Every structure is written in C-alpha cells, then in structure tokens.
C-alpha cells in the first residue's frame, strides 16, 4: 500500500485543477520573481502571449507605443481595436519628451505606455525618465527586454510597472522552447483586486484572466526556463564577446550596422533580399538568442520606417568561424579587418 501523499503541493489559492499552476511553473515563477525583484511573475506559453496577456490584464483605454515597439504587439492590438474601446497612439520615440507628453495629455485611463529596451535597432530607452513622466499622468509603463534578456536589462529597477520577456530567446537559449513571462512591480498589485467577469472560484483576478485566455505554461517549458537561468550568465557573456568582435569588424569595414553593446543581436542596413541565402552556416529563422547563429531578413520600412535590414543573431560558435561565413555572404574581405580588431581587443 502506498504511503499517504499530499499531492496538493501548490498553494490552492493559485491553483485550479493544477491547470494554471503546477510545481514546475510555481518554482520557476518564484525564481524569476527574485531575479527581477518583482511583486509577481506570470509564466506564459510564449513571449507574444505574455504581451497580449499583460494588455488584457490592464485593459487600457489608451495604448501608447513608438515606431520601435515590437511589431507583432502593434499589429495585434490594431486588429483588436475593431471590438475593444481603446485609443491607439503611435509616436516616433518614447524618448521624445514633448511627443510623449502630448500623447499623455487628455488620454483616457487606464493608460499603458509600451516600448522595447533595447530595441532591435540598438536603442536603449530612458526607462526612468519615460516612467516618471508617464506616472505624472497616471499611466503605467511596460517594457520588453527580450533583445538582451533580464541578464542585461531589468526595467523594473528603473521604475517600469511591467516587464515582458520572451524566454524563447536567450533564457532558454536553444531555440526549442516556447515560453514568456510577465514581471509585475508593486504598483500593479491592484490587478489582483479588480473585478473580472465570471470570476473563477479560488483564483484571484490575475490568474482568472490568464486561465480564461488559455495562456498556460506547461511544466516542461517551465523546467527549460529554470534550467536556462543556470547558464544564462555564461552564455550572455559569450554572445556579447563574439557579437562585439563581429560588430566592430563590420563597422570598420564601413557597413551600416547597429548593436546595443549587449547580447548577440546585430542589425545590418541595406542588405539585398538574397543576402540570407548566401550563408553556409547561419540559419535563416525568425528568432534570436540561440546557441546557433541565425539571420533574418525583413523589409523594415513597412512598419519601422527605416528601410531594409537584416538581423544577425550571433551564437556560441567560434567567432573566427562566423566571420568567415559573414565574409563570404557579404562578398567583401573581412578577415584581415577582423584579425586587427581581435588584436586590439586582446590589447585592451
């Protein structure tokens, strides 16, 4: 006969038939909460769903974004606008104080200001300044830090109310797991007290919304996130070191290139559509932050108003090997420049 076991290992106030939570999810959320210094972290089934769920939780009457805010978030919200009562405002830059102030004035509350820090285009937002101004108008700020992960960017520390991250990228790091997260500051505790239609017995407001959306992180993904956190520091340092070498080489070769200074994501301007097809090693996929290097071409003028660009995600391979693949893809000599840059780096 089996011994008596208590299978109800998760706080029953946050559990409904073990669907919204289980031990793996609860454990990983607690790890992330401590790392962010957050009031609460909600593990989601993807980064995009984390963004959508955060918006569903706040239910803004005004959403303010800028030209570099994650494209899928903006497209999805504009699609939703057909049946929700919300004003959508897109400005050129959240760092433009006058433009942001103008958009906040007379905006309907709740107001949610959304940005990326850093963005695909290597711009680090002044989160402290943006959040301070937004709070003067009773607005909340949400920043996506997926481009460099929580290892390098934690907007909560600079006054943001919400941080959303795609753990599919650097945190899991292998391109084989879908997961995302919402980190909430103390300022968002009101979300658990707000009224929700048809509340779920035993669940507070936040988990009721998460449950209703079907945004359920599975135990294996939670485990992958937790495991990824163990090696995140080592991997991020390697991504950064290799990407810095390659960025400096491309810049010295007079190629239009942008890099935030952290992580492995590099953006190149003016590449032809067949550029990504020339690689022998770089894989053409629409993600980044993986152990393997990949490239992704997109026509950014369609939504970023910035022209044609290609994102290179520098993986954990030997940068000597990677620069040779980039050299043959660009069809310009880079090796000697690379050796010079590498030598200068060693001297530093």
Residue ranges and their predicted role:
Residues 251, 256-342:
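Conserved C-terminal alpha-helix-loop-beta "cap" of PLP-dependent enzymes
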Residues 32-36:
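A short, N-terminal amphipathic alpha-helix
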Residues 3, 178-180, 264-266:
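Structural beta-strand/beta-sheet cores of well-ordered domains, especially the beta-sheet scaffolds
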């Amino acid at each position: 006969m089996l011994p008596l076991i208590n299978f109800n290992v998760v706080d029953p106030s946050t559990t409904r038939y073990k669907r919204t939570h289980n031990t793996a999810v609860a454990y990983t959320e607690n790890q992330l909460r401590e790392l962010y210094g957050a009031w609460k972290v909600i593990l989601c089934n993807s980064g995009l769903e984390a963004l959508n769920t955060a918006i569903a939780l706040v239910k803004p009457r005004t959403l303010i974004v800028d030209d570099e805010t994650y494209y899928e978030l903006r497209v999805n919200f504009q699609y939703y606008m057909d049946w929700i009562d919300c004003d959508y405002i897109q400005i050129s830059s959240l760092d433009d104080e006058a433009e942001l102030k103008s958009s906040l004035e007379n905006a309907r509350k709740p107001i949610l200001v959304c940005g990326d820090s850093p963005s695909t285009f290597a711009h680090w937002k002044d989160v402290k300044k943006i959040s301070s101004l937004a709070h003067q108008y009773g607005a909340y700020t949400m920043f996506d830090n997926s481009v460099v992960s929580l290892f390098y960017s934690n907007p909560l520390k600079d006054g943001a109310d919400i941080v959303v991250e795609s753990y599919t990228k650097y945190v899991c790091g292998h391109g084989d797991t879908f997961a995302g997260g919402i980190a909430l500051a103390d300022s968002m505790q009101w979300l658990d007290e707000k009224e929700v239609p048809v509340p779920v017995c035993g669940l507070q407001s936040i988990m009721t919304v998460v449950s209703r959306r079907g945004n359920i992180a599975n135990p294996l993904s939670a485990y992958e996130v937790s495991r990824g956190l163990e090696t995140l520091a080592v991997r991020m340092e390697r991504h950064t070191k290799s990407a810095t070498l390659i960025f400096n080489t491309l810049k010295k070769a007079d190629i239009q290139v942008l890099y935030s200074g952290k992580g492995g994501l590099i953006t190149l301007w003016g590449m032809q559509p067949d550029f990504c097809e020339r690689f022998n090693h770089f894989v053409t996929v629409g993600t980044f932050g993986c152990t393997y290097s990949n490239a992704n071409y997109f026509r950014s003028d369609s939504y970023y108003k910035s022209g044609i660009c290609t994102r290179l995600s520098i993986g954990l391979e030997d940068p000597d090997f990677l620069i040779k693949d980039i050299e043959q893809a660009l069809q310009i000599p880079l090796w000697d420049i690379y050796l010079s840059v590498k030598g200068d780096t060693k001297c530093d």
